[in-house]
């Protein structure tokens, strides 16, 4: 509710299948919303406000140039993503922020539906639609970001480290 007061154009979509399928199920629910839009993972804190720009001229995915990573990354040629993989050398570590122009957004709408409904499709990450399964339909540019621009929060303790207002909460038990 706090976000809606500050940003009344935000639309929240509840995915009751999030425990049963991979994140492609969430993308499938909003597949018609990708045109001229940013997509952001919910576990990111943006420290550089210039990450979100008023104008984008081509579809892109944020990545940080690294020598080695065991995280999701992509290779590129002439600034275009050529391959997504888990772990790599001399590549771009993938950050969960991307932008899609109108043409790519239209293609994403149909490609997500196609992949979602194929055998094994519900186990895919949505990014695999554009960066792997249907990659020949797209020219996704690498948009480079740097250390300190974005922080990923994977645990409650990591959240408490950057936001002391959560210190009053005790450790969550399973």
Regions picked out by a protein language model, each given a short descriptive name:
Residues 94-174:
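Conserved alpha/beta core of the MobA/IspD/sugar-nucleotide pyrophosphorylase nucleotidyltransferase superfamily
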Residues 1:
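A conserved acidic beta->alpha catalytic loop
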Residues 4-6, 75-76, 132-134:
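Short, conserved catalytic or adaptor-binding loops enriched in Gly and charged residues
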Residues 4-71:
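Conserved beta-loop-beta/alpha segment of the NTase-like Rossmann-fold superfamily
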Residues 9-11, 80, 139-141:
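Conserved beta-strand segments of alpha/beta enzyme cores
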Residues 18-21, 79-80, 133-135:
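Short, motif-level signal for alpha-helix interfacial/capping segments enriched in acidic residues
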Residues 47-120:
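Conserved core of the sugar-phosphate nucleotidyltransferase
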């Amino acid at each position: 509710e706090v976000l809606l007061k500050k940003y009344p154009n935000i639309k929240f979509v509840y995915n009751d299948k999030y425990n049963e399928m991979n994140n492609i199920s969430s993308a499938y629910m909003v597949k018609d919303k990708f045109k001229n839009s940013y997509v952001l993972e919910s576990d990111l804190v943006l420290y550089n406000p210039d990450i979100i720009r008023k104008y984008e001229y081509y579809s892109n995915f944020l990545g940080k140039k690294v020598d080695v990573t065991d995280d999701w990354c992509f290779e590129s040629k002439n600034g275009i993503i050529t391959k997504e993989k888990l772990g790599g050398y001399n590549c771009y570590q993938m950050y969960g922020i991307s932008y899609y122009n109108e043409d790519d957004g239209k293609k994403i709408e149909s490609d997500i539906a196609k992949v979602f409904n194929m055998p094994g499709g519900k186990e895919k990450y949505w990014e695999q639609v554009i960066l792997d399964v249907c990659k020949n339909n797209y020219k996704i540019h690498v948009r480079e970001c740097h250390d300190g621009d974005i922080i990923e929060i994977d645990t409650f303790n990591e959240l408490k480290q950057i936001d002391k207002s959560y210190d009053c909460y005790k450790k969550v038990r399973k």
